[in-house]
Amino acid sequence: MLQAVAPSHLAPLGAPPGPRAVVVLGAGKIGRTIARMLHGTGDYAVTVVDRDAPQLAGMPAGIAVRQADPTAAGACIALLDGAWAVLNALPFHAATAVATAAAELGVHYFDLTEDVAATHAIRQLAPGARSVLMPQCGLAPGFIGVVGHDLARRFLRDGGELLSLRMRVGALPRYPSNALKYNLTWSTEGLINEYCNPCEAIVGGRRVEVPALEGLESFALDGIEYEAFNTSGGLGTLPETLAGRARDVDYKSIRYPGHCAAMKLLLDDLRLRERRDWLRDIFDSAIPQTEQDVVVIFATATGRTRAGQGPLVQASFSARIGGTETDAGHVNAIQLTTAAGICTALDLVATGVLPQSGFVRQEAMPLDAFLANRFGRQYTCHPLEETAA
């Protein structure tokens, strides 16, 4: 169930009291969920921008709407002028342009991108920035980086040794019924990006790139069988943060068994990797969307808490998160978790927990502060049990 998001009556840092003006770019399912979450607190004055008028219909009273194309040349500057923060829920290819406008205006910037190149470009804007630039604020990348860093810190804080850190996340249909055993619950473009682009990892203490769809493994959680394989972008900036401090770090997407083989047929044998536009059209026309989904999160770290001493120790985090009903209707699991991630990042900047300018990594958020946050507590769920598949 969606936990109530109570007002906190934020005390603005160096600004007069009152709701902070935030702009949400993109009125898709996740953008609308973000807007409703923030508006419900009373601490944020929310404006939602989308180029399509039908997407803006039905917003709750009190949320301002504006029909405009934020990707049009020069439009973003006008849309963000006077805002305290912008939350970018547009496709990944819009990230750099929006972040550039935000940095120019001194507006705090948050996004959901999984695109590694976009994140690198945004980081180049950070030197001398007057505002926060914080990409990758969703589920993966996003929350999983917060979890991974917390697990790693348990071993490294007292001079210990981190041997492996495995992070696994899946946004899955509850009732798979096709050969892919998959339904669309989020951005098709983002999904294809994850399946086609190189994946960052740490192997043998060295930062490397590994191919997507490789590294297939099988396991079970709470008696349900899954597979997991390399996908791009899920680690965010964690490989850089843990470089030279961990032996092996990787991220894989969780799917039902058989999905990886089917995707290799499409991408490699049929060469749709070379025609991503075709693949997007096929997915959008042939794979049903679903509101009946579940998010599965599983992360495990192994090492020694004191350098060269003591027994080998394992620490884990796991959760299964479903959708929920709200006054505005059903919110599915991927919408809930993604929106909660970016809203928590915004809140932690607003309350001074995070830095107030420059590039901010996801792992800068302490896990306990994240889960205690009024938005972040959506992630507090019953842990899962792993068994060999």
Locate predicted features.
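N-terminal Rossmann-fold NAD(P) dinucleotide-binding loop
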Residues: 31-32
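C-terminal catalytic/substrate-binding lobe primarily of soluble NAD(P)-dependent oxidoreductases
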Residues: 2-10, 154-389
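Rossmann-fold cofactor-recognition segment
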Residues: 60-72
